[in-house]
């Protein structure tokens, strides 16, 4: 637990603040909805889903945020332009302020979402996910023409998962690339780049993933985060072991939540914690660590931005 010498940028997107010194702001929690094989979705191509179930899940997150003081963001995943537009319509109808990630495994879907958010006037809340080494020119062009000003900038280096490899992909590019991801994001008109350290599996770069958090904050002064739960989900031993146990979820969830807490204590500003169904487990745990970070921030002379609503005050 520490204080960075470099000025730490704070970006406000849809009323949620990302960045700052460790403990200065509560950690931002990012849920995922409409992911592959999400039980509430009945047609992934058309975006047909159980609206009542989705709203119940969302309201649970809102309630836990109210209780703990941790802000939240929603990651909206779509497999087709039609489906992601339908999901966005639903979300902006039930929530008129919260920021959301527009995400898909397909670049054309992400591009369509950025364009759609511009058309319906919610681009100021949209966060493009992501600008990465495989982004194609079509997506770059649409993003540049859109009103979207925030994006996840992914530090994934397919050939070098070390801290240096992650830094290189951000600053100079990688194999076949002539520009770093940060330069590309700037050329796309992104004013609020949120770096994702690209969490790697245990045994294949998980250590450098965590070490890259304070390294990047010290180097760039930008908000840093990631989908750290992927470390647990990609852990072959745990996947096999939990199947031998009577309660697989009880075996799995401590590791899932734990990956986030390790990253949080290392300085991660936001956590893409995965399926929104895990909301009850993640919020109290992250709030607990935020209390520790808040106490440390005070000790180091960091002024907590909204002390009354920070877990260090709200929950003690």
Swiss-Prot record:
Record's keyword terms, sorted: Methanogenesis, Methyltransferase, One-carbon metabolism, Transferase, Translocase
GO molecular function terms noted in the UniProt entry: tetrahydromethanopterin S-methyltransferase activity
Pfam families: MtrH
SUPFAM superfamilies for this protein: Dihydropteroate synthetase-like
EC assignment: 7.2.1.4
GO biological process, one term: one-carbon metabolic process
InterPro entries: Dihydropteroate_synth-like_sf (IPR011005), MeTrfase_MtrH/MtxH (IPR023467), MtrH (IPR028342)
Pathway connected to this protein: One-carbon metabolism; methanogenesis from CO(2); methyl-coenzyme M from 5,10-methylene-5,6,7,8-tetrahydromethanopterin: step 2/2
Keyword Translocase (UniProt): yes
Catalytic activity line of the entry: 5-methyl-5,6,7,8-tetrahydromethanopterin + coenzyme M + 2 Na(+)(in) = 5,6,7,8-tetrahydromethanopterin + methyl-coenzyme M + 2 Na(+)(out)
Function: Part of a complex that catalyzes the formation of methyl-coenzyme M and tetrahydromethanopterin from coenzyme M and methyl-tetrahydromethanopterin. This is an energy-conserving, sodium-ion translocating step. MtrH catalyzes the transfer of the methyl group from methyl-tetrahydromethanopterin to the corrinoid prosthetic group of MtrA.
UniProt family annotation: Belongs to the MtrH family.
Record text on subunit structure and interactions: The complex is composed of 8 subunits; MtrA, MtrB, MtrC, MtrD, MtrE, MtrF, MtrG and MtrH.
Full protein name: Tetrahydromethanopterin S-methyltransferase subunit H
Organism per entry: Methanosarcina barkeri (strain Fusaro / DSM 804)
Lineage: Archaea, Methanobacteriati, Methanobacteriota, Stenosarchaea group, Methanomicrobia
């Amino acid at each position: 637990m520490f204080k960075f010498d470099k000025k730490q940028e704070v970006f406000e997107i849809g009323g949620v603040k990302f960045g700052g010194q460790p403990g200065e702001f509560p950690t931002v929690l990012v849920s995922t909805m409409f992911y592959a094989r999400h039980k509430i979705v009945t047609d992934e191509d058309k975006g047909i889903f159980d609206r009542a179930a989705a709203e119940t899940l969302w309201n649970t997150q809102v309630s836990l945020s109210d209780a703990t003081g941790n802000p939240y963001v929603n990651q909206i995943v779509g497999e087709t332009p039609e489906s992601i537009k339908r999901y966005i319509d639903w979300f902006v109808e039930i929530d008129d302020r919260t920021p959301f990630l527009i995400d898909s495994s397909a670049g054309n879907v992400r591009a369509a979402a950025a364009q759609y958010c511009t058309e319906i006037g919610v681009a100021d809340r949209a966060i493009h996910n992501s600008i990465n080494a495989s982004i194609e020119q079509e997506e770059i062009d649409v993003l540049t023409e859109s009103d979207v000003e925030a994006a996840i900038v992914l530090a994934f280096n397919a050939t070098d998962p070390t801290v240096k490899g992650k830094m290189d992909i951000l600053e100079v590019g990688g194999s076949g690339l002539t520009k770093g991801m940060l330069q590309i994001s700037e050329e796309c008109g992104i004013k609020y780049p949120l770096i994702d350290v690209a969490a790697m599996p245990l045994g294949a770069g998980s250590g450098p993933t965590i070490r890259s958090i304070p390294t990047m904050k010290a180097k760039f002064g930008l908000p840093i985060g990631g989908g750290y739960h992927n470390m647990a989900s990609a852990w072959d031993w745990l996947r096999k072991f939990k199947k031998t146990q009577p309660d697989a979820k009880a075996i799995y969830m401590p590791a899932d939540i734990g990956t986030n807490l390790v990253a949080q204590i290392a300085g991660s500003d936001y956590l893409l914690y995965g399926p929104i169904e895990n909301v009850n487990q993640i919020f109290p745990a992250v709030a607990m660590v935020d209390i520790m970070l808040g106490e440390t921030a005070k000790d180091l002379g960091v002024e907590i931005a909204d002390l009354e609503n920070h877990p260090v005050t709200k929950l003690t």
